[in-house]
Amino acid sequence: MSAVNGNDGDSIIAEERLRPLSRDELERYHRNALVPQVGVVGQQRIRASRVLLVGAGGLGAPAALYLAAAGVGTIGLIDDDDVDVTNLQRQVIHITAAVGRPKVDSAAEAIRALNPDVEVVTHRTRLTADNALGLLRGWDVVIDGTDNFPTRYLVNDAAVLLGLPLVHGAVLGFNGQVGVFDARRGPCYRCLHPTPPPAGSVPSCAEAGVLGVLPGIIGTMQAAEALKLIIGGAEPLLGRLALLDVWGGRLREIPVAKHPACPVCGENPTITALVTEADSCTIPQTPGADAQPHARTAEDDSHRQSEGSRPDSSASPRIQGTGEAPTAESAADTVSAAELRQLLAGAEPPALLDVREEIEVTLEPMEGALHIPLREVVARMDELDVACTTVVVCAAGIRSARAIEALRAAGYTGRLVNLDGGVKAWAAG
């Protein structure tokens, strides 16, 4: 196959959009064009393409850099977050000096520095049911680098309604996954997971962590899948989900079939307009979070209502679900940070159990708390005093709720109360 003629396979880029490459472009992308499956025509397709990245974080960062380096003509970025110091461990498009800046601005600056010929379109906004169709319309392919389930489902549904291919990616710990969803010729994300998981049912990267190189691997794989769709003639991960265990050094794939009962792309779809899944999956963004595999994770429910916005807030704090001022004995299953402060100042303060990891406790200690990591809490439950109420805490109230469930299932008979919003809410006052 000629490196000049390129690949004659099915590309998502219409031939009428192609134009000759300049001498400077031929020199810059020479190594791409030397690959027979790419060729000059393939490079023309890359240069003519428009790729939208939803999320400029752990997955979007490497994807954006490699797409820019490859010569993608226009790259779009959607993200409403600012760069946080915790992002720098893996979000390689951002530098230390960018901390506090909008991610889309930091990423756009890095893209332009790498390849000034790339047009960058930025949207510093959160994707919603009201703006998603307008923001996704007109792009050739969408890369999902979202960090929460409501947005992930929204991106999928918008892509289906607009007839766009969607490149999915997710990471957590040592595990990642990548696949291509295109309802016109295969399944969509809802064919695999029809509805979001319950809020708090799975941990976030902020809670469970992620090995910094993993988003780089998965994000780069997403960029490769997008380029394959653009160039044509390749075998995209359509109807297949690649699963990577970087710790075990294993890469495998599972088939994903188009589901006839899929609510958005099935034979009788029930989703014909966009809705945000926030009611069934209240999972706002967490600084430093990344997209997570559905089966293992959910985004950290870390921005719950503050004490000042709670319907039952008053000068005399109440236990949630009661009309009484809090006491250790009357405490319900959940207690706010303000209520916990009142309990601790009382005559019979509750015990505190911190189920976070050691590094979290070191960075932000909870004074007076017994520290037992979540994974050890059942095995060490004899260290707890069943005679008194124990308030269980974690970063945001997710792991602590799971710790309470595990302890009760294991037969613990003492009273257990969850700190709503966790240490984040406690630190916020």
Regions found by a protein language model. Give the residues of each.
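Structural scaffold elements adjacent to functional motifs in cytosolic proteins
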Residues: 352-354
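A structural motif
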Residues: 72, 366, 412-413
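Histidine-bearing beta->alpha loop at or near hydrolase active sites
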Residues: 421-425
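C-terminal accessory/binding modules appended to enzymatic or scaffolding proteins
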Residues: 341-348, 357-366, 372-374
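A short, well-structured juxtamembrane/interface segment
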Residues: 330-346
